[in-house]
Amino acid sequence: MLTRPARILRQGCLTSGLLFSGFLSFLSLPVLAQDGAYSEPAGFAECKARLQEQAITAGVSSKTASEVMSEVRHLARVIELDRRQPEFTTTFADYLNRRVNDARVSKGRELLKEHQELLARVTRETGLPAPYLVAFWGLETNFGSYFGKMPVPSSLTTLACDPRRSTFFTEQLIAALRIIDEGAIPADQMEGSWAGAMGHVQFMPTVFLKHAVDADGDGRRDLWNSLPDAMMSAGRFLESMNWDGDYRWGREVLLPENFDYSLADGRRLPLEQWREMGITDAFGKPLAREPINAALVVPAGHRGPAFLAYHNFRVIMGWNRSEFYAIAVGHLADRIAGAGKLQNPPPEDAPALSRANIINLQKALQQRGYEPGNPDGIMGPATRSAIRQFQAANNLVADGYPGESVLAALEIPAGQ
């Protein structure tokens, strides 16, 4: 396992959501034959050769391409992790509690003060408020304490040679080789997540190439060892997605009794219209009269918190296309800036659905004439829309959430 350069900042400690370092070293091991020697799956060598030629054609130097690709190994564990995405089965309560907790809030506030000069510079140049920058940093790498230990060239080659998302990861691999080619980091030090995300803010290689900057003036775009480079790059990336510095990400709100939860379907309405429906802020005060649109989000259904998501919520989702993630970033930023906990925390007893649960739910909806999309075990917009329609037709709260009442009505055991 490669040793990380000494310059890397190491604030904070690993959270419960991260794996023990000994196990992590196992994750990066290649496929081994019975005698312990490295063994590649059939066709992998040919795939590597094709990718090397593609990289050279795309402008990577022959020297870099050949040297890096000669050291690439197939990582079977990467394929396993690519097939198993925990975002699909965790509850909102579990997700939020793991990512926005007192320890992380306290550390974030400490770092907000420690790096106030740097963060103020990033805010001046990009428009990104400091608490959001620190929140992204906290969620991505626990404030720089863990960047991932997978060898990025090997991870990306493994994924590029897998047919499921070959085109996407081929592009990422070529971008990673270009990053090495420009001298940002030596190939043997390019470590990251199993999917190839790198550095303090976990940029994918294509995002790195387009948005990473040299903010400390040392001639390199170094997102591993330079916090100025990492923070400014994060600011530039979010700025490129039209972050609106005049408004926050959104806010927790209170809904009136007998509210029509079918409105929480992604539609964006003027804030004044939500106000006229009786929605208030989390403390019962009237919403501000601002000329902006917002969408209502109820990530844990009608039993959990409700949020009005503004334009910047969509910008956050441009970084990570998960509503859970976007809420976590916004809420953590609020907490770091001094706000308190949610007024209506998510229910701890919500059922945690497996892929099998969701597939059975999707099939049950199909059998009843609804259109949840292909039964793939993913709670996407089509599935939520079908749930909402089923709920409305069966006198259930139409929040689009697969709670116990929906599972019972569809005769699906929660533990199935």
Question: What is the meaning of each model-derived region?
Answer:
Residues A33-P41:
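Cleaved targeting-peptide boundary
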Residues A42-S62, S66:
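Mature N-terminal segment immediately following signal peptide/propeptide cleavage
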